[in-house]
Amino acid sequence: MNAEIIAVGTELLLGQIANTNAQFLSEKLASIGINVYYHTVVGDNNKRLQQAIEVAEERADMLIFTGGLGPTKDDLTKETIASSLGEELVYDENALALISDYFKRTGREFTENNKKQALVLNGANVFANDHGMAPGMGLNKNGKVYILLPGPPKEMKPMYVSYVEPFLRNFTTGENIYSRVLRFFGIGESQLEVKVQDLIDGQTNPTIAPLANDGEVTLRLTAKHQNVDEAEKLIQHVEDLILERVGEFFYGYDQEFLHYKAIELLKKKGLTLACAESLTGGLFGNQVTESAGVSSVFKGGVICYHNDVKQHVLHVPEEVLSTDGAVSKECARYLAENVKELLKADIGISFTGVAGPDASEHKEPGTVFVGLAIKDEPTVVFPLNLSGSRQQIRERSAKYGFYHLYKKLEEI
C-alpha cells in the first residue's frame, strides 16, 4: 500500500516550525510495510488543501493528514475532507465529554468553537487523544484510507503508537520490514558508490540506500519478508558482499556513532586517553564526555590554542614553533606525546591546523594534523586536507581523530 503524508499548517510553510511529524510517520509506516512516496505541506487554506487531496487521491492508496483539527477558524482539515468525501461531521460523545470535563475542571467557559474539536467524520474509526483534546480518525472510503491526526507531536506520536498503527495493520500484507544501517568513515559517498554500484543497480529485496552526512557515509539495507529471520538473512547476504569490497572503512551499525565506538574500545582495552586541542578547541573532549562512565578512561585535555600554552604547558620546543610552525607534523607529534605524559595517560591525541577562513603560517584552510601517541607504540601523525566552513573543518577534524583512534585500537 502506498501512502502520502499531507501536513496542514501555514506555520510549516513559513518555516516557523519543522515538519517532524512526517519524519516520524515515514519511519513508522515503513516498518509495517506501507510505502511513503510523497510528503506534501499545505497552508491553512481550504482551496489549496482540496487541490492537495485531489492530487494525492490520484497517486496514493492512503492519505494521512496531520494538523488542522483544532478549535480555531483556520483549523479546517476535517471540514475540507468531509466536503471532499460527501460525509457529514458528527460529534464524538467521548471526545465531547473529555473536552467539557476539562473546561469544568479549569473553570473556563466552554465555547462553541471548542466543541468543534469533538467533531469527527461520520462512520470513522475514532482514535482517542490521551494527550490533548482533538481526537484522530480513520475512514476507509472509495477504495482509499483517510487518516486524520492532530498536529502537535506530543499528541500525534502517542496516538499513532497506541491506536493508529494497530488500525493500519488491517491494510498491510503482513510483511515485516527489517532495516540495518552500515556506517563508514574515511571514504567519500561517490567512491563508496562506485565500489558497490552493481549491487545498487541490481537491488530488489533488500534495497540499498546510500547517504552522506558530515564526512560519513551510511548504507541503509532494507528487506521485506513475512518472516523476520528470513528478512535478516536477506540483509546479511548483501552486507557480506558490501563488506568484502569496502570493509576497511566500516566501523559500526545503526546508532553506533564513531565517538561511542572509540570509547567502547578504550574501555574494553583498559586504556586511558588524554587530548591536546588547538584547532578543535575542546570539540573532541566534549564528544568524549558524552559517553556515560567515561571517567574510567578519559584523563582530561588541554586546550592549547595559543603558542604560549603549546610551549610552556605542553613543552613543544620553541624551535619547532618558529621553524615548522604550530600547524605542522612535528608540533602535532609533540602535543600528543606530551599531553600523554602530562596527564599520565596511555594514549595522547592532538589536533592542530587551520580552520579558516584565512590562511595561517602560509598554510591553507583545511590543513590539519592529528597526532596519536600510544604507549609502547611509535607515534603517528595523520595529515588531513579538509574542505568546508570553519566549523565543518573543526568538527571533521575531531571525527577523524575518533576514526584514527578507533582503527589504531583495533590493531593493538
UniProtKB/Swiss-Prot annotation:
Gene3D superfamilies: 3.30.70.2860, CinA-like (3.90.950.20), MoaB/Mog-like domain (3.40.980.10). Pfam families: CinA, CinA_KH, MoCF_biosynth. Belongs to the CinA family. PANTHER family: NICOTINAMIDE-NUCLEOTIDE AMIDOHYDROLASE PNCC (PTHR13939), NMN AMIDOHYDROLASE-LIKE PROTEIN YFAY (PTHR13939:SF0). This is Putative competence-damage inducible protein. It comes from Bacillus cereus (strain ATCC 10987 / NRS 248). The lineage of its organism: Bacteria, Bacillati, Bacillota, Bacilli, Bacillales.
